[in-house]
Amino acid sequence: MAENKAGTSNRGPMGGRGPMGGGRRMMQGGEKAKNFSGSFKKLIRYIGNYKFAILAVMIFAAISTVFSVAGPKVMGKATTALAEGLMKKIAGTGGIDFTRIGKILLLTLGLYLTSTVFNFLQGWIMTGVTQKICYRLRKEISEKINRMPMKYFESRTYGEVLSRITNDVDTLGQGLNQSVTQVITSTATLIGVVVMMLTISPLMTLIAFIILPVSAILMSTVVKFSQKYFRTQQEYLGHINGQVEESYGGHLVIKAFNKEKDMVKTFDETNGVLYESAWKSQFLSGLMQPIMAFVGNLGYAGVAISGGLLAIRGTIGVGDIQAFIQYVKNFTQPIQQIAQVINQVQSMTAASERVFEFLEEEEEDQEHEGAVSVENVTGEVKFFHVNFGYNPNQTIINDFSVDVKPGQKIAIVGPTGAGKTTMVKLLMRFYDVNSGQILLDNHDVRDYNRRDLRKAFGMVLQDTWLYKGTIMENIRYGRLDATDEEVIEAAKAAHADSFIRTLPGGYNMELNEDASTVSQGQKQLLTIARAILADSKVMILDEATSSVDTRTEALIQKAMDNLMEGRTSFVIAHRLSTIKNADVILVMKDGDIIEQGNHEELLAKGGFYAQLYNSQFEEAA
């Protein structure tokens, strides 16, 4: 299918949203998944493909933690040796054994260096795993997009779909990289620290443990109150993005109708709700760290007092107090880190939930066994008692029937909402009929593979869709294996060659993202050249001249005549003057064909077509 591709109006091929721009749904810390446990299990299964790498991360993290946890205990021996030496020196019975202290310090340095090396290794492996997962997810989403039915995209904004590829995958990757590593190291640190604390003093360990239930209660309370505000924040952030997108995309209409103040007022109301929910959610979330720090300081005080009493009794050494206080710090720090990870895990799981929801969406059936080949289609098309509605409860096309011979030019006219474009969508199987049949060369279109079927069609739309690249590349999009000479011949047939050669760089001129360096009429000629190059058997032209001036329309009409020559063509037109030479004109109203015939026959009938035609010329006069 020669598809009309480019981003001049941020709209995609059938008038729907295009793939670029607009409304990103940004992830915020603390957003909660609808089904946390289910989504988290899916995420675990997904990363199961990297279980050996994750296992290596866990082993290296554990080894790093063991060496790190042993450090304070060894350092405490140096402090004890120094204190004992000072006491002996004061008592006159000896002095400080610097050799012993030096060996202890070297051992401590070795422990921390080894810990750092293993920490680096686990971080390096985990980063690789995370990026591979993100790469794989983006690839799967990209492939999924091409298998999605048209109804999915027409029911959602392109910003929402774009967010799955960018924000959600990035949030998942960052959360996975940081939270998994943090959970492993924090858990290993907690276990190691508890063991070392117990070897120093069970009593001091018991005092330090008193802070655990207090911390858990305070943390769960804060999380409980903050969750509802995080959800409101995320919801209204989406509203903000949507309003900004609408304001940007429709700024000309907004200015033309003097609606700037109304738009600002609406935005301010939404922004106010976002501000309030964001302030409360961030404030409550920000309380976690100071609360945990306060509880931790209480633990330090209890440990210091009890340790001092035990040292006076000679139960433990001075270095043991130093080591224990360091362990208390190392004990509370992982708890604080886990508290921070909770919000991160929620965001990560919520992001993965949306990604997996998208990947599990219903797909179009692309291929089936025994499919009919489109290699030698002639372009004969039949609509046989077709009924269709986007909503099952509301029929748009009612018992539609028509026979189209190969090479015929069929014009479809009627008021907005009559079902003209819907007929094209059914023909190309963007949607399937509710009942009836559409035949291509006497085969039901459902007997063809969708991809093969669409190769038989070329399209030129009102909303030109060019992409960032050279003019040569944009025309060649119709047939990627075309030579430069074939591209130029197609441009000549489309009456585009002359204006292309006047541009800086000619065919090699680079178009920007919205193709604003060429006029609307020139864009249309380029898309016609692309369709000519594709050389499809059936052409579809949907309001191709509705957005250009009369002079440009005449040029485009000549190009369209060249394009349609020898091909079955369906022309959806608003300007009836452009379809006077059609073999058959189908006049649609409310999903029904109310009249059909050629231009002269329909005028002679004096019916609905004649009213439309005469009204247009009265307006022109």
What are these regions (language model features)?
Residues 26-31, 131, 139-163, 167-169, ...:
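Short intracellular "coupling" helices and adjacent cytoplasmic loop segments at the cytosolic face
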Residues 2-5, 367-368, 374-621:
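ABC-type nucleotide-binding domain
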Residues 36, 54-118, 199-203, 314-318:
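Transmembrane helix-loop-helix hairpins at lipid-water interfaces of multipass membrane proteins
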Residues 35-51, 161:
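A short amphipathic helical element positioned immediately N-terminal to and/or at the very start
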Residues 48, 106, 118, 122, ...:
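Hydrophobic alpha-helical transmembrane segments of ABC transporter permease domains
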Residues 85, 196-211, 280-353, 358-359:
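Helix-loop-helix
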Residues 49, 53-66, 77, 178-232, ...:
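Transmembrane helices of ABC transporter permease
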